[in-house]
């Protein structure tokens, strides 16, 4: 297995949880239930695992990681204009909503850490930066971030949402055409 710190803003806004990726390397089916975790022979916490078939792994979280701090920031949403076109008396406008989030991770420990940052997955939104996540569950992206001892690192997550709008030109769309013709975001094509 692998020791990690697991950050989810909705679980604890400031600190990640200590975690461990447990892999069942036996030929036996491990039944669900409570387990006790030790770190270098010292009690680290208790956790509960779900059924674990042979060859599969589970992420277990068991205690707050007080030596690591995460500061999430949201730079707000913006809209970018993609295209404006005319077709059969209708103006078609394509925009893209953009959301930019950053996670500043401070490792105050004397050991390097791998932080798994959980970020909400929304089906309509497309991941723009980074291009893909380390893993994805039904409701979450998970991004892996390595942080050296006594250092900080930042993960930036940028997502886009396509928005389509159509305006019938007989509804006073001439003013709209003039507006989009003057904007610097649209190419003359």
Segments the model singles out, each with a brief description of its role:
Residues 1-104, 111-124, 128-129, 133-145, ...:
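Intrinsically disordered, low-complexity Ser/Thr/Pro/Gly-rich interaction regions
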């Amino acid at each position: 297995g692998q020791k990690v710190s697991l950050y989810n803003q909705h679980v604890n806004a400031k600190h990640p949880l200590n975690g461990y990726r447990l892999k069942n390397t036996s030929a036996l089916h491990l039944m669900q239930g409570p387990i006790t975790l030790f770190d270098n022979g010292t009690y680290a916490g208790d956790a509960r695992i779900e059924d674990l078939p042979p060859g599969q792994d589970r992420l277990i979280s068991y205690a707050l990681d007080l030596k690591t701090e995460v500061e999430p920031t949201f730079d707000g949403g913006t809209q970018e204009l993609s295209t404006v076109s005319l077709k059969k008396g209708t103006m078609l406008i394509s925009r893209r909503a953009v959301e930019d989030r950053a996670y500043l991770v401070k490792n105050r420990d004397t050991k390097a850490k791998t932080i798994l940052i959980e970020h909400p997955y929304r089906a309509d939104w497309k991941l723009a930066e980074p291009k893909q996540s380390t893993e994805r569950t039904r409701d979450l992206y998970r991004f892996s971030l390595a942080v050296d001892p006594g250092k900080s690192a930042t993960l930036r997550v940028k997502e886009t949402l396509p928005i389509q709008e159509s305006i019938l030109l007989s509804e006073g769309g001439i003013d709209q055409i003039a507006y989009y013709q003057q904007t610097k975001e649209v190419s003359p094509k």
